[in-house]
């Protein structure tokens, strides 16, 4: 495997340190039922009283070939017919429920939703998914545009893959609420390129991350990035057999390791 040049490494590092907010909520959709504030990061649904269902869309589509992660803080107590997070296409209907109370995201084939009541919805079909969420919870959403999977997190704990076969579909982040004076804050909206390097992150154990961070300071931008946790597969690392650390002189970097470390390390013969 060819080594990674310093210019390529710098580009990847800049990629990982891109803006904490690559997108915000679309102010063009602001109506009397939706109030945006704090540079369009905060949303207040139905500021006075509610007469139906309101929805907000991200101001940018989610680019293909990337891992996308965004996180929404539930500021207020949640109640009522439904409060949902999810994604939708440009054809997703955003205004047809302004005078009726409903679970809007996932009512048709153009959107996919996760309800605060703990169920998923798409194409009008619902199924039980995970725990409920409410005030002070952080709801995370991870879209892998390469594999076409969408999964949700609550307080950084993964709930498992929710939807599949989302490849080659241009999607936008969506949130909806029927609740009066419901406040949400977009705390993260970031992405990284899908690559062998990011794939390596999915199988690194905590002690391996700590070791690489110590031995290869240039990798800290990668290992200490939020995606190092988001992409982590569910593997039992409590078993001591998995935590054996070999002396450095016996370590040989194979192509898998070399892809992660990049330039500057050569294999021992």
What are these regions (language model features)?
Residues 1-269:
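PRY/SPRY (B30.2) beta-sandwich protein-interaction domains
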